[in-house]
UniProtKB/Swiss-Prot annotation:
The modification N6-(pyridoxal phosphate)lysine is found at K212. This is Histidinol-phosphate aminotransferase. The lineage of its organism: Bacteria, Pseudomonadati, Pseudomonadota, Gammaproteobacteria, Enterobacterales. PANTHER family: HISTIDINOL-PHOSPHATE AMINOTRANSFERASE, HISTIDINOL-PHOSPHATE AMINOTRANSFERASE-RELATED. One of its GO terms (biological process) is L-histidine biosynthetic process.
Length: 359
C-alpha cells in the first residue's frame, strides 16, 4: 500500500519545522534553542491523574491574571505558543480564500502552521538590517488576510519592533484583520509589552509563554491575551482537555510572588551575560562581521565564515543555531545566552578562531 498517495499533496511537499531537538548535535553547552540555561527545582505533591483536567484551569488563569495585570476573561491557556499560533489560524481562516501575513526573518511556525492547516501566506519581509515592519507593503495584502503575525522581540534577530509601527498596523487593520504579537521573549524587555492596549484594540492578540524567562520550556504552557469575544470563539475550537494537571500545578508554583522575583533576578544576571558576550564578540574583528543588538535571551552574529565557526563550536561541544538559510541572514549564527561559564567558553573558542584567522 502506497501511503504517500493518501497524504495531502501540500503535506507531501511541506518542509517541516526543524526544532533544536530534531537537528540534534552532541555537546555539553546547548545554546541553540533559547532555553534558560539552568533548571528549576519543581515539587509535585498529591497530583490526581485519574480525572481529566479542566479545559481552562481556574487557579492558573487567576495566577497569570495577577502576574500580567489583565482580567481573567482576557486569557486563554494553551500548550505553548505553538498551539496558540495554530488555534488562531483554525478559528479565523477559511482555506478557500483567506491568508495570513508573516514577516521574515522571523519564527518559522507562523508559516508552517498555516501550510499544515491548508492556509496560504503572504510573505512581507522585514526591512533589511533594521528588521522593522514594511507597513506600506503589508497594507497591500490586508484585504484578504485574516491574521498578521509579528514577533516582538523578533526571533531570530533579537530586535524590538517599532511601537508606532504596531499602532499604525492596529489602526489600519481595525475591523478587518487580527494583529497577533508574539511576546515569547518580552520578559527580557518588559516595558515594551503591549498588554495595556488589549482594551483599546479589539483586533490585538498577544501570545505569551512560560518557556523562556520562567525556564519551563519542557512544561509547554502558553497564553493568549486578547479581548473577551475572541477568547469565546477560541474556546469553541481548542481541545477539550488541553492543559495537563501537572502542568497547572507547576505553572502555579512559578507564578508565586517569590518565584516571579527569582525569575526577574535570573533575567538581570542573564542580561549582564548578554552585554558581556556582545562586547567580547564585537572586539573579534577577524572573524566577526557584525553583532546585532538584542533585547532577548539570544544574540544574532554575522561571521565572515559562519560554517567554519559553527563546525568548530560543535567540535568543542558548543551547540548554536545556524540561521544562514533564512532571508537576509547569510553567514549568521544565533547564540542563546548561557551561564557565565558557558559564555566564557564560547568567547574562548571564538577568540582562538579570531587570533588564528581559522575561518
Amino acid at each position: 500500500m502506497n501511503i504517500k498517495k493518501l497524504v495531502r499533496k501540500d503535506i507531501r511537499e511541506l518542509i517541516p519545522y526543524q526544532s533544536a531537538r530534531k537537528i540534534g548535535g552532541k555537546g555539553d553547552i546547548w545554546l541553540n534553542a533559547n532555553e534558560f540555561p539552568e533548571f528549576n527545582n519543581i515539587k509535585l505533591n498529591n497530583i490526581i491523574l485519574n480525572r481529566y483536567p479542566e479545559c481552562q484551569p481556574e487557579q492558573l488563569t487567576s495566577c497569570y491574571s495577577s502576574y500580567i495585570g489583565i482580567n481573567k476573561s482576557n486569557i486563554l491557556i494553551t500548550r505553548g505558543i505553538d498551539e496558540a499560533i495554530e488555534l488562531l489560524i483554525k478559528t479565523f481562516c477559511n482555506p478557500q480564500n483567506e491568508k495570513i501575513i508573516f514577516c521574515p526573518p522571523t519564527y518559522d511556525m507562523y508559516n508552517i502552521s498555516a501550510k499544515i492547516i491548508g492556509i496560504k501566506s503572504y510573505e512581507v519581509p522585514l526591512l533589511n538590517f533594521s528588521w522593522q515592519l514594511d507597513i506600506n507593503n503589508i497594507a497591500k495584502y490586508i484585504s484578504d488576510a485574516k491574521l498578521i503575525y509579528i514577533c516582538n522581540p523578533n526571533n531570530p534577530t533579537g530586535n524590538l519592533i517599532n511601537y508606532q509601527d504596531i499602532i499604525t498596523l492596529l489602526n489600519i487593520t481595525l475591523g478587518k484583520t487580527l494583529v497577533i504579537v508574539d511576546e515569547a521573549y518580552i520578559e527580557f524587555s518588559p516595558i515594551h509589552s503591549l498588554t495595556n492596549l488589549i482594551d483599546t484594540y479589539p483586533n490585538l492578540v498577544i501570545l505569551r509563554t512560560l518557556s523562556k524567562a520562567f525556564a519551563l520550556a519542557g512544561l509547554r504552557c502558553g497564553f493568549i491575551l486578547t479581548n473577551v469575544n475572541i477568547v469565546k470563539f477560541l474556546l469553541k475550537v481548542i481541545n477539550p482537555y488541553p492543559i495537563p494537571i501537572p502542568t497547572t500545578s507547576i505553572a502555579v508554583q512559578f507564578l508565586s510572588k517569590n518565584n516571579i522575583n527569582e525569575m526577574r533576578n535570573r533575567i538581570f544576571d542573564l542580561t549582564l551575560n548578554r552585554f558581556w558576550l556582545v562586547n567580547k564578540l564585537k572586539s573579534m574583528n577577524n572573524c566577526v562581521e557584525h553583532v546585532f543588538n538584542s533585547f532577548a535571551n539570544y544574540i544574532l552574529v554575522r561571521f565572515y565564515n559562519s560554517r567554519k565557526v559553527f563546525d568548530i563550536l560543535s567540535k568543542k561541544g558548543i551547540i548554536v543555531r545556524d540561521q544562514s538559510n533564512k532571508l537576509h541572514l547569510s553567514r549568521c549564527l544565533r547564540i542563546s545566552i548561557g551561564t557565565s561559564k558557558e559564555c566564557l567558553e564560547v568567547v574562548r573558542v571564538i577568540q582562538k578562531i579570531n587570533s588564528l584567522c581559522v575561518y
